[in-house]
């Protein structure tokens, strides 16, 4: 160093390593001391010295110089271990995907950082003269991050969207990468290549637009005479000192600064480093500085408002083109930094948090009232303290006190024993970082097909009551219960045992409203019973509560299922909207011969309402007559005979998107028509061999393996991912007149009628159906289709149905036979292959006479009674007209309905006691109750019905396990209301009316072990489904529009020990959800998670399920109980994370701020704030002042916040740009106002954009108010709204700009640079500026007071002084980057 100076004697010798930043500091100090020329001489000597030394050392770099860090192996192993534990937690549903991602990123980031810190000490100890170490740590070439990738580990990378990939690259480049790691690490390289191409042009265009806005801004004066300033308060906790210094250095003071009475700085003095240090030491009041914002010149800027020139540190020269410098300074980092796309991780919020560790072993104590439980952002349980918390740790000999700051997490429980150095609390990082936080949505997709359940109530999104977007109010689990929509028409196996209760959805019958009361039948008069006997060997029935209100998302008034049924009764026609209801169907096995003669193969089904209550005129039983059964698909039509009768008599109504015919007139339907058609439903991928609107013959090949059964016209339609191919048989006719087609479309024509509209007149023998077809290109034609007529016969005589005796007891009970059509008028009916369609159903309608006052009730109770004779069971239907004496209303928390068992009631009160004695009932236990019901598939077009029954008889046997029997007896004594959860049977089975238990031993019981074997049932099963119950014991009624199929391999059978029964009810309850590895039995943990759906005496059936954790504020998609297929979105989490570090993500932000676009939903809506300010100020201050001050205040506010926004982007990239550059740009895009009213039509047009100062000056000159409001222009708009049309035309939209300028007769004063360049004149900057200095000599000599004698001017100044406090407050805090606290809605996106 001695070489540097001549006078060596008084030199100070500093023995210190100098890196890049130190060199920068040295150079700036040298310039300050010695000036430019001497400094360059010194630096030349330093350069020569450096090169000489480097040559002498002759460093070379070989692959052996890359030394890996020895501790890496166990660090990676440790991280792997943590990750495995995390995986397990996620699998068991303890943490959700976002928490898992966050934590795994943090684990790997910490590992990577630790390796990076080890790197330098490792080199220093092992090989201090290692070339890699010397190069990178001296700052000559390469940085710590690059060396870390060479010898540590590459760590976490981000994908092209800037999201982290949670699979880290564990190898470093010295060891070599595996294939996966190589592909992941190529993301960065590819991104670099793409960015270089794409983003460079973006940055260039940004620079061009910026320069365009400010190209005319030149320093043209020394002082504009402004008295305004922007105040900066001295550094406090909020604003780092560094930023305070950067803000002040090089500015000019706008006011005198006093300490006490002593003035330490004068107005218009420029601020150097010495003055700033004095400000910091004295902690003065806010300092008022001049900025480009405060300059009063309209289209240029003065020296004092600009301040020092950054190049030489003196006041800026006159004629300097500061606008262009500003535009380029903002655009340049963009072009440079696009090439810098290294991701070094650090993508989670706030870095790793600080930890508080226990000072010694001992018991920890704190006040539990001051903390409340919460989850950390990794999903771990913790306590959050809102104020300072004092924690004491008592060890044997000493008590430690630790204070934990507010907003920290306490990770241990009260009175817990902690070890020394154990982490007891986590302090949230309170330091302010310049990271961009953005809100990210993370979608979680379901892994398997199944049915969705959740274990808490959810909120609906307020705008859409019926939408499937629900917000979670608290942390809960979502379960996907296995099972999917059916693929085939036969279920592989049944888990129901013989004689389980069946529950069937039947869609096309009419039902009244859901009733909420559940009654226990009590009857005073035993003689009044109706026994309705027949050879039932089917089901036991009882009043079953209607669970439909537990379907928490049931939309009562928004039912989209309409199945109109026509009840042919007393010539009345009803349109019965089908509600979602369940029904019990019992098939009769006909034993008497004469009934077999009547209906050889049809079965009668009895239905009992869910709650056991019949209304008047309700349907008791029905049977399907074979003569109304059809094999193929088709359409039904009915109505009075006549040419246009059908269109006249019915109105087409739209209901929930389904077109229905609503009859207006009451007609008696005595015949209806069936128009057959052949329908094939094929997947989208099938190739079809026939064309739409073509005509084919019988047995034509349609697809590879299907042939048509009839000939006719082919229609092909695509509906929700399926192809619907219909073949209409019939003749084709070409009509004479076009307009008559549409009138005759879709009508029935009786036989013998001649139609003149067709070219060939012809009489038809049978009924025909006329339908017009519109092909794509050819002419229209009409299709005449054959029709099948069905007459509806009169009711069947009742005597054939029932034995004589019961009906002869006169008890005002009537049974009437009614036929009704199952399908609506004009509704297409789709037949599934191999099944038949029933067109007409015959029903028994139950009615009773109201004449008898004693029994004139609106409803009646029905229940099934079983009588056992010689070990055979007979079922009777008992209809009970007397109102019950006790009826319970169900509570919401008691979904099972109240069930009464009473010891002290007489035998007369309960009809069942006449059949079984009380002791007998107590002894019997029902082993299995079960429900099966059917559903429609989603398209609501095909129907399926299950009736599970078996014709074998059973014996009744006593129950042999005494232990269990005692438990039941005890519980009956203790609590007469036995809840469903502890009872046996499949999930969702309801209790009996008189809650008696009995065992049924069937002769051919399905063995549980051979669970794939299915008894030969007479019906083919289509869909199998259960009631499902959630964790709260609420049974919910599933949606009939969906269907689900159990895969037998998804059900896990769990066998219980025999001696296990007594404790079973406490451990396993029906409907309970299990997580994986929960112990159910003594044999060890259960291996899969699931829900218990069947509890039997010796075994439990568990339906496998997958749990997903969701936290509050997450959005759940889909309805409760909806069937989701694999890959459907389940939940959306919204979480915050900081942006990954590269400017390419920052550049678009800068552009959006400068173009004043709203960034997205979380945007800083500056424009809205501007409007708000405008309105409020005008209201407060009245018209003339309001406009002026409103515009001023608004502009000041928005300017400062814009500057902060832009600075934030660049600072987060570590790029230093002086504020004044940004200020010049922002000044241009905020300096225009919009003329709002045409009060001043002779000066400005409404909607015209003018400069704020021009508006003020015009207002002063005309002495009347101009109405205007502040407006924010983007940089593109600002470039197209300048004073020079030549400059605008050279930027964009040349023809439009020039045409407009010509029409308006605009004059261009050629004040800017660009106009002069275009026209080849002298540019008015630098040396060219000197020729322009003309009129300002005597202008500057006029004293300030005479200039300001205008009254308006003085008052305006006063007002601005009054409001200065407000500015000071807003502005000072704003410069400290707290705009988000001040202005709501300014979230950083």
Curated annotation (Swiss-Prot):
UniProt GO MF annotations: DNA binding; DNA-directed RNA polymerase activity; zinc ion binding
Entry's cofactor comment: Binds 1 Zn(2+) ion per subunit.
Keywords: Chloroplast, DNA-directed RNA polymerase, Metal-binding, Nucleotidyltransferase, Plastid, Transcription, Transferase, Zinc
Swiss-Prot/TrEMBL cofactor(s): Zn(2+)
Gene3D superfamilies, alphabetized: 1.10.132.30, 1.10.150.390, 1.10.1790.20, RNA polymerase Rpb1, domain 3 (1.10.274.100)
InterPro entries xref list: DNA-dir_RpoC2_beta_pp, RNA_pol_beta''_euk, RNA_pol_Rpb1_3_sf, RNA_pol_Rpb1_4, RNA_pol_Rpb1_5, Rpb1_funnel_sf
Top-tier EC class: transferase
PANTHER family documented for this protein: DNA-DIRECTED RNA POLYMERASE SUBUNIT BETA (PTHR34995:SF1)
Protein name (database record): DNA-directed RNA polymerase subunit beta''
Originating species: Morus indica (Mulberry)
């Amino acid at each position: 160093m001695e070489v540097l100076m001549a006078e060596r004697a008084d030199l100070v010798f500093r023995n210190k390593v100098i890196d890049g930043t130190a060199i920068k500091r040295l150079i700036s100090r040298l310039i300050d001391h010695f000036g430019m020329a001497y400094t360059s001489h010194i630096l030349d000597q330093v350069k020569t010295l450096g090169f000489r030394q480097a040559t002498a050392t002759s460093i070379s770099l070989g692959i052996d110089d890359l030394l890996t860090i020895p501790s890496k192996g166990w660090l990676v192993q440790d991280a792997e271990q943590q990750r495995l534990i995390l995986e397990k937690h996620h699998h068991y549903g303890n943490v959700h995907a976002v928490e898992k991602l966050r934590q795994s990123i943090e684990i790997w980031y910490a590992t990577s950082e630790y390796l990076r810190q080890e790197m330098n000490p490792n080199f220093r100890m092992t090989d201090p003269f290692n070339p890699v170490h010397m190069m990178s740590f001296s700052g000559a070439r390469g940085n710590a991050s690059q060396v870390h990738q060479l010898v540590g580990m590459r760590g976490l990378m981000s994908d092209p969207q800037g999201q982290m990939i949670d699979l880290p690259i564990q190898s470093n480049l010295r060891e070599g990468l595996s294939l996966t790691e190589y592909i992941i690490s190529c993301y960065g390289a590819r991104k670099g290549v793409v960015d270089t191409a794409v983003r460079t042009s973006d940055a260039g265009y940004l620079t061009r637009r910026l320069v365009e806005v400010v190209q005319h801004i030149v320093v043209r004066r020394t002082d504009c005479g402004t008295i305004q300033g922007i105040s900066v308060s001295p550094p406090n906790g909020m604003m780092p000192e560094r930023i305070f210094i950067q803000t002040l250095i090089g500015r000019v003071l706008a006011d005198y600064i006093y300490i006490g009475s002593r003035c330490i700085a004068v107005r218009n003095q420029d601020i150097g480093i010495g003055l700033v240090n004095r400000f910091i030491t004295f902690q003065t009041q806010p300092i008022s500085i001049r900025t480009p914002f405060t300059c009063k010149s309209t289209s240029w800027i003065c020296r004092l408002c600009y301040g020092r020139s950054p190049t030489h540190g003196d006041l800026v020269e006159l004629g300097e083109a500061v606008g262009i410098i500003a535009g380029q300074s903002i655009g340049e980092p963009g072009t440079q930094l696009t090439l810098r796309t290294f991701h070094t991780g650090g993508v989670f919020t706030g870095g790793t948090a600080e930890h508080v560790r226990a000072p010694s072993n001992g018991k920890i104590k704190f006040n539990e009232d001051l903390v409340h439980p919460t989850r950390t952002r990794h999903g771990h349980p913790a306590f959050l303290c809102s104020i300072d918390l004092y924690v004491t740790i008592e060890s044997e000999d000493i008590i430690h006190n630790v204070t934990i700051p507010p907003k920290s997490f306490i990770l241990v429980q009260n009175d817990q024993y902690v070890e020394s150095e154990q982490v007891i609390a986590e302090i949230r990082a309170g330091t302010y970082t310049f990271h961009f936080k953005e809100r990210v949505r993370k979608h979680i997709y379901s892994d398997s097909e199944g049915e969705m359940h959740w274990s808490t109530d959810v909120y609906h999104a307020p705008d859409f009551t019926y939408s499937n977007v629900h917000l979670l109010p608290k942390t809960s689990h979502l379960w996907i219960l296995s099972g999917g929509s059916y693929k085939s028409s036969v279920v592989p196996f049944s888990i129901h045992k013989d004689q389980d209760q069946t529950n069937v959805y039947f869609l096309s019958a009419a039902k009244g409203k859901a009733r909420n009361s559940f009654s226990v039948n009590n009857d005073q008069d035993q003689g009044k019973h109706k026994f309705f006997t027949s050879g039932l060997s089917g089901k036991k029935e009882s009043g079953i509560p209607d669970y439909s209100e537990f379907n928490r998302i049931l939309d009562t008034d928004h039912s989209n299922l309409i199945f109109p049924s026509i009840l042919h009764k007393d010539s009345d026609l009803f349109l019965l909207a089908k509600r979602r209801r369940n029904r019990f169907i019992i098939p009769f096995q006909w034993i008497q011969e004469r009934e077999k003669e009547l209906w050889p193969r049809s079965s009668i089904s009895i239905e009992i309402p869910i709650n056991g209550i019949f209304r008047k005129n309700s349907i008791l039983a029905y049977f399907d007559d074979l003569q109304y059964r059809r094999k193929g698909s088709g359409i039904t039509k009915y109505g009075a005979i006549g040419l246009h009768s059908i269109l006249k008599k019915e109105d087409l109504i739209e209901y929930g998107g389904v077109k229905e015919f609503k009859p207006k007139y009451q007609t008696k339907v005595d015949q209806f028509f069936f128009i057959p058609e052949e329908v094939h439903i094929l997947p989208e991928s099938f190739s079809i061999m026939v064309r739409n609107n073509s005509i084919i013959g019988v047995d034509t090949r349609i697809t590879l393996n299907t042939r048509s059964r009839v000939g006719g016209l082919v229609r092909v339609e695509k509906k929700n991912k399926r192809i619907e191919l219909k073949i209409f048989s019939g003749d084709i006719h070409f009509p004479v007149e076009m307009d008559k087609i549409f009138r005759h479309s879709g009508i029935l024509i009786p036989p013998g009628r001649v139609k003149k509209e067709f070219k060939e007149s012809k009489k038809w023998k049978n009924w025909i159906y006329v339908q017009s077809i519109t092909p794509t290109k050819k002419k229209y034609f009409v299709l005449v289709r054959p029709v099948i007529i069905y007459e509806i016969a009169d009711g069947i005589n009742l005597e054939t149905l029932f034995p004589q005796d019961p009906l002869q007891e006169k008890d005002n009970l009537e049974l009437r036979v009614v036929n009704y059509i199952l399908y609506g008028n004009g509704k297409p009916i789709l037949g599934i292959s191999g099944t038949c369609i029933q067109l007409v159903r015959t029903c028994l309608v139950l009615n009773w006479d109201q004449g008898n006052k004693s029994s004139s009730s609106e409803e009646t109770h029905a229940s099934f009674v079983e009588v056992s004779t010689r070990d055979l069971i007979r079922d009777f239907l008992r209809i009970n007209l007397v109102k019950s004496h006790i009826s319970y209303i169900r509570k919401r928390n008691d979904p099972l309905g109240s069930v009464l068992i009473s010891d002290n009631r007489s035998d007369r009160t309960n009809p069942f006691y006449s059949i079984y004695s009380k002791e007998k009932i107590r002894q019997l236990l029902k082993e299995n109750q079960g429900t099966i019901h059917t559903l429609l598939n989603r398209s609501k077009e095909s129907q399926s019905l299950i009736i599970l029954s078996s014709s074998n008889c059973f014996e009744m046997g006593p129950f042999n396990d005494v232990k269990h029997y005692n438990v039941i007896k005890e519980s009956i004594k203790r609590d007469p209301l036995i809840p469903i959860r502890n009872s046996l049977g499949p999930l969702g089975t309801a209790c009996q009316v008189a809650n008696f238990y009995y065992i049924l031993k069937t002769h051919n019981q399905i063995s549980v072990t051979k669970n794939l074997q299915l008894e030969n049932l007479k019906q083919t099963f289509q869909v199998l489904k259960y009631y499902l119950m959630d964790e709260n014991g609420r049974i919910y009624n599933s949606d009939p529009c969906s269907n689900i199929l159990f895969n037998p391999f998804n059900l896990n059978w769990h066998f219980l020990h025999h001696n296990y029964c007594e404790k079973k009810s406490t451990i396993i309850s029906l409907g309970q959800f299990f997580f994986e590895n929960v112990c159910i039995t003594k044999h060890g943990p259960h291996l899969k998670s699931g829900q218990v759906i069947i509890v039997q005496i010796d075994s439990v059936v568990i339906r496998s399920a997958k749990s997903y954790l969701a936290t509050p504020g997450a959005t759940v998609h889909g309805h409760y109980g909806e069937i989701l297929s694999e890959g459907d979105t389940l939940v959306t989490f919204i979480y915050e994370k900081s942006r990954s570090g590269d400017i390419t993500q920052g550049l678009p932000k800068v552009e959006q701020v400068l173009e004043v676009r709203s960034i997205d939903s979380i945007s800083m809506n500056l424009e809205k704030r501007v409007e708000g300010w405008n309105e409020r100020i005008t209201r407060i201050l009245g018209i003339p002042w309001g406009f002026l001050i409103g515009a001023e205040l608004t502009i000041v506010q928005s300017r400062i916040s814009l500057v902060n926004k832009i600075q934030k982007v660049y600072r987060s990239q570590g790029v230093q740009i002086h504020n004044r550059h940004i200020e010049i740009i922002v000044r241009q895009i905020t300096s225009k106002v919009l003329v709002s009213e045409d009060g001043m039509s002779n000066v400005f047009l409404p909607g015209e954009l003018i400069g704020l100062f021009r508006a003020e000056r015009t207002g002063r000159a005309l002495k009347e108010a101009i109405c205007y409001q502040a407006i924010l222009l983007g940089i593109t708009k600002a470039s197209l709204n300048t004073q020079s049309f030549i400059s605008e035309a050279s930027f964009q939209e040349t023809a439009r700009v020039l045409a407009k300028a010509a029409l308006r007769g605009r004059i261009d004063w050629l004040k800017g640079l660009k106009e002069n360049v275009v026209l080849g004149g002298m540019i008015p900057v630098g040396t060219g500026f000197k020729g322009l200095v003309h009129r300002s000599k005597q202008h500057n000599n006029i004293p300030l007071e005479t200039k300001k004698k205008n009254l308006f001017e003085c008052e305006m100044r006063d007002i601005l002084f009054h409001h200065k406090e407000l500015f000071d407050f807003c502005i000072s805090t704003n410069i400290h980057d707290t705009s988000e606290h001040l202005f709501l809605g300014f979230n950083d996106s």
